[in-house]
Amino acid sequence: MRLLSFVTSIFLCSTFYGKQSESCFASQKNVPNLISFAAGDYNVFHTASKENTGMVQLEVKGPPVFDRKYFKVRAFGAGLVNFQGSLWIGGGINFDIWFGRPFVMTLGIGPGYFSKGKGKDLGYPMEVRSSVEFAYQTPKLSRVGLQFYHLSNASFSSKNPGVECLLLFYAIPL
């Protein structure tokens, strides 16, 4: 698996950077704050449901508070709204895990305020977002990728249906 990742990194670096340069594999020393714009599917696993709808999201990722070569911890703040008026606003922590320079996987978790609008009732005004995203980082430090997450009230209420979201995002440095 490591060999496949290395070969893929060499191919992408030579394709997008024009040559196999050392900078392509350099550590992520200067990780910028990011603002991310995303759109996708709300309640993605229940496409026949009336509660399945589109959504948009805005997210800001702060500077790393724990910084190692291939692992970074940073705070995030985000807001989402779906096309039925449901709203989630919250924040938490993200864990950036680097696989060569251009590829990063981010795991995240954080609580937030939820309002159902005319959408699915998730059972409680506090919902926790647990997420995973896979992204390609361009030479200018912007990112493009997919994000998947689950919103759940973590059983603070007896009603805890949760919802899954799948988004395509584009993040730019601040």
PLM region descriptions:
Residues 44-54, 69, 79-90, 99-101, ...:
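Solvent-exposed loop/turn segments connecting transmembrane beta-strands
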Residues 35-45, 70-83, 105-115, 144-152:
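Transmembrane beta-strand segments that form the barrel wall of outer-membrane beta-barrel proteins
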Residues 54-58, 135, 161-174:
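Outer-membrane beta-barrel "beta-signal"
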